[in-house]
């Protein structure tokens, strides 16, 4: 099911980087978790760390910081598995149910594909709507909005409600 959803009101857009894959924002605050491809040299991803993950802390003036150990191991970190040269399967540590596949296109740019509700998209952003009344140490998702492009290059957004 595809929805015509717009960006959340007043949420900042992180500064664009050359190797941006996607970013994640959530309903608790404006802080943003950014995922950039990590190239050793042009067209070749680092096998040791193919994705560079960091956060932009808008609650502290928009400064860039590494993930905390807690964030990396339990929330916004990723596990990765090499499929072939410049192709990796990625899993978010907080929810391994989403299969993300990172590839490098013929233009040398990296991108991430995922399938949500039987629709494959090139992912550019995720928004996590957290259930109200939960602590930060025991959060529950109400839904996830996936933003990106469909197979025809059209902008799309998909709402996923975890069961």
Residue locations for each model-derived region?
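Mature extracytoplasmic domains of secretory-pathway proteins
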Residues: 50-121
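Short secondary-structure capping micro-motifs at structural edges
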Residues: 76-78, 131-134
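Short, exposed beta-strand-loop hairpins at the edges of beta-sheets
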Residues: 133-159
